[in-house]
Structures are given as structure tokens and as C-alpha cells.
A protein has these predicted regions:
Chain A
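An N-terminal domain-start capping segment
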Residues: 24, 28, 43-49, 110-118, ...
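Conserved amphipathic alpha-helical segments that form helical-bundle/coiled-coil interaction surfaces
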Residues: 70-152, 163-169, 181-196
Length: 212, 254
């Protein structure tokens, strides 16, 4: 919980309107929540890359970027993080990722939505192992736009077996500190995901990115 | 007309991510979205006038407070501006990577991220842009003015250096990667490079830009990637040596 409005007014010595606008601008990025009602007020929120993705997609839209370009960016950036994860990752954490992958694979095998549901968690775990939070945040922001906008029209469920195997192999390469292999496997995996999107959505992906 | 309190979060996104982190969509967000769509639908470009506040109030059927908040959300990102004085009002702004950079730093700062993280990110993005630029058919034309860098002008004018990198970002073709790279490079140049004395580096920087312009114009992708990587690693190395503590400093939100 942040200090109440009255305290902030005194502390920052600004007008009520300016303070409210400032809070609203930070709220627009999802970094604080304004709790309404008595006992309410500004509360510190979590940092979600999806919110940055939403703002970034407005820039992408205005600069004329297409969904195909977004996918290409994702195909490039995700493997960078897999490589960094293999180079820097804490071995115990990397082994946990492998164990998690194996468990998740067993749990979702045969559940047609399972792989898609698990995918963001896997990629996020790799990003956290990378040791570069700036690149992770920027990549996760793009991933969020991909999930919110492209995965609405593309159905990846028939490829789930392949994707789960890919994840497991990438996790294993990271755990073995084999950076080159991790990057190669992550690239192949992302190209595979991209190919599925191109195959299903085709020319639709040449449209400009929407802001929603 | 947009009903007050419209929310598209529940229905549209639930299936993908069970725990939806995105904040609740407010009326002002929906109005902002509508303004952005109308800019496109009406074919408005930078500097064009938007409808007056009064006519937008009527068109969107929302309160003045919500409309003004929507304006402010877009104004902060530079997408609309306000022309002051009589006959003034909202006009279409432009897409500037520095505004995206500024918003990003809010996340970077709160996430406890450092300039060192930003350096490592730049070392990946910039060489990639150089490689991609080599496939652009306009590369000769756009690199032409950098081919004959006059070493006597020495002190490698910062604006000129920025212009060189801007051109490379744009030549990269992929606008998502170009925006991201420009945002990262902008942050490093304003927060770090602008505070450093680059005198010792400037002569070699100018020569490096000239060499890079040449290999990009010639379309030598692998060489362009290698040189660009070297170019930034040299700058980062210089900074690391002179001001090692700066790398561990939190990225500032300005």
C-alpha cells in the first residue's frame, strides 16, 4: 500500500489534479492499482511484461509493424535468452526447470489445450534463468502480444507433442550448460511455432499490429 | 458510442492465460483505443488536426473526464499533441522510440534492472540490425553520407553518431526490432554516453561508423554484424573501465 492521497499531496507539494493524473499514468502501466472506496487508495502492483506489451503494441501499430515482424522478432529474441540461460544459469534452478518440464509433459499429454497453456510458463522460466531482466522483459512483452493477438486466431494444439519435446530438449541443454545447443534448439522450436502460424494465418499476418 | 466501464478482458483472453495479469480496461482506455482507430480510419498523419473535444465528447458518448484521461494517455506516449492558443486543439503526433524507452524504464526501474543489463541487451540488438540492414535494397543510398567520415571533424558529433545508428535501425526493415533497438540505444546514449567524456573514443568511433557504412552498403552481412558488435563492446569496455560503478546503477525513470 502506498501512502494515502492526503499524505502524498503534502509530500510532493502538487495539486490534487496533478497527483491523480500522475497516479493514473502509472496505473495505466499496471504498476499500481487504485483501490476504490473507503480504506482504498493506491496499491503497488506487480510488474507484468504484458502491460508493457500493450503499450509497445501501440508503438508497433503506429510505426506500421506487422504480425509477421512481431513473430520474426520473437523467433530472434527467445533463442538469445535460451543461450544466456545455458551460459549463466544456476545449475540447481536449471535442473528444476528440466524436472518441471518432464512433470508438465506428463500432466498435459493428451490434453489438447495443455501444451499451449504450459508454453508461456516454460518460456518465462527460461527468461528468468537468463540473468538479463531487460531483455527478458522486452521479449516477454512481445510474447504477450503474440499470445493475446495471434494465438486467438491460430490453433497450435495439434503440434503439442512436438512442442513439449522441444521444451524438454531445450531445458536439458540449458541444464547441461550447452549454450550453442540451447540456442540452436530454441531457434528450431521458435521457427516451428512461426511456421505453424504462417501456415494457418498466412496473409492475415501481413496486417498491421492492432492495439487493444 | 462506448458504454462506460466496457471491459473486454474476461471474454477475450481467459482461455489463453488463466491468471490474467493485465490490468482492468477502463473507459478512458477504450476511448484512447477508439481515437487511435479513428486516426487510422480517417487516414490522418502527423500534424493533422483531430476533431475538437466537443465533437469527440458527442461522438464517443463518454464523460469529459474519461475523454481527457484518454488524451493524456496518448499524449504521454507522444501519439497526440495539443496545439495551444485560439484555433488550437488535439493534433496527431508521432512515434518516437524515446517515448517507448521512457515508458520501459518505468518497468526497468521498478524491476531493479541495471545499466549493465541494458548494455548486454544492446550488444545483441545492434549487431542484429547491422546484419538485417545488409539485405535492404536502399542501403547504398542511406549509407552514402557516412562513407566519407571526415576525421578532422573529429569530436564525432553526437547528433551525427545518433543519425548513423538511426539509419541502420531503419534499414533493418523489421519495425519491431528497429523500435526496440532504438529504444535501448537511446537510453544508453542519454543516460550513460551523454555523461561521459568520449574524447578518447570519438576519433575511432567516427572511423568505425565509416567502416560499418561501407560493409553495410556492400551488403556484407557477417562482417557488418561482427564490426557492430565490436563497436559497442569497445564503448562498453571503455565505460566499464572508467566508471565501473555505473553498470550496477539502477536504470533511471525520467
Amino acid at each position: 500500500m502506498l501512502p494515502p492521497e492526503s499524505a502524498m499531496l503534502e509530500q510532493y507539494r502538487v495539486g490534487r489534479a496533478s497527483l491523480r493524473e500522475a497516479l493514473r499514468l502509472i496505473e495505466a502501466q499496471g504498476l499500481i492499482t487504485l483501490k476504490p472506496g473507503p480504506g482504498g487508495g493506491p496499491v503497488v502492483g506487480d510488474i507484468h511484461a504484458a502491460n508493457l506489451g500493450r503499450t509497445a503494441s501501440l508503438y508497433f501499430r503506429f510505426s506500421g509493424a506487422t504480425y509477421r515482424q512481431l513473430i520474426e522478432a520473437m523467433v530472434t529474441m527467445d533463442p538469445w535468452l535460451a543461450e544466456l540461460a545455458a551460459l549463466r544459469a544456476d545449475r540447481d534452478m536449471a535442473n528444476e526447470l528440466v524436472a518441471l518440464c518432464i512433470a508438465e509433459t506428463k500432466a498435459v499429454r493428451g490434453d489438447s489445450e495443455g501444451a499451449v497453456r504450459f508454453a508461456p510458463g516454460f518460456h518465462q522460466a527460461v527468461y528468468e534463468l537468463s540473468g538479463n531482466p531487460v531483455l527478458s522483459t522486452m521479449t516477454a512483452a512481445i510474447d504477450a502480444v503474440f499470445i493475446e493477438q495471434i494465438l486467438r486466431t491460430v490453433d497450435l494444439s495439434s503440434h503439442q507433442g512436438q512442442f513439449l519435446d522441444d521444451h524438454q530438449a531445450i531445458a536439458q541443454a540449458i541444464a547441461n550448460a550447452d549454450a550453442e545447443l540451447a540456442k540452436t534448439l530454441a531457434t528450431a522450436h521458435m521457427q516451428n511455432v512461426a511456421a505453424c502460424c504462417y501456415e494457418q494465418a498466412g496473409a492475415q499476418l501481413d496486417r498491421r499490429i492492432e492495439w487493444r | 458510442m462506448i458504454p462506460e466501464g466496457t471491459s473486454d478482458t474476461a471474454s477475450a483472453r481467459g482461455a489463453m492465460k488463466p491468471s490474467d495479469p493485465r490490468r482492468v480496461i477502463k473507459t478512458s482506455d477504450t476511448v484512447a483505443l477508439q481515437i487511435v482507430r479513428d486516426i487510422k480510419a480517417r487516414g490522418l498523419v502527423k500534424g493533422d488536426r483531430l476533431p475538437s473535444e466537443t465533437s469527440m465528447l458527442q461522438e464517443y458518448g463518454v464523460s469529459r473526464g474519461s475523454l481527457r484521461e484518454a488524451f493524456r494517455l496518448l499524449e504521454v506516449q507522444g501519439f497526440i499533441r495539443f496545439k495551444p492558443g485560439p484555433g488550437g486543439g488535439p493534433i496527431v503526433g508521432s512515434v518516437e522510440p524515446e517515448n517507448l524507452a521512457r515508458t520501459s524504464t518505468l518497468y526497468f526501474h521498478l524491476g531493479g534492472m541495471t545499466y549493465g543489463d541494458l548494455f548486454s541487451t544492446q550488444e545483441l540488438f545492434e549487431p542484429l540490425c547491422a546484419r538485417l540492414a545488409c539485405a535492404n535494397p536502399d542501403r547504398h543510398e542511406r549509407m552514402a553520407s557516412f562513407l566519407h567520415g571526415d576525421a578532422l571533424l573529429g569530436s564525432a558529433d553526437r547528433a551525427d553518431a545518433a543519425r548513423f545508428h538511426d539509419e541502420v535501425h531503419q534499414l533493418a526493415g523489421n519495425r519491431v526490432l528497429a523500435l526496440y533497438t532504438a529504444a535501448v540505444t537511446h537510453l544508453i546514449s542519454t543516460d550513460i554516453m551523454a555523461t561521459m567524456d568520449l574524447a578518447e573514443l570519438s576519433a575511432s568511433m567516427l572511423e568505425e561508423h565509416r567502416q560499418l557504412a561501407q560493409v553495410i552498403a556492400d551488403g556484407e552481412a557477417a562482417e557488418a554484424e561482427r564490426l557492430m558488435s565490436q563497436h559497442f563492446k569497445a564503448q562498453h569496455g571503455y565505460c566499464r573501465q572508467r566508471w565501473p560503478s555505473r553498470l550496477n546503477e539502477l536504470i533511471e525513470w525520467r
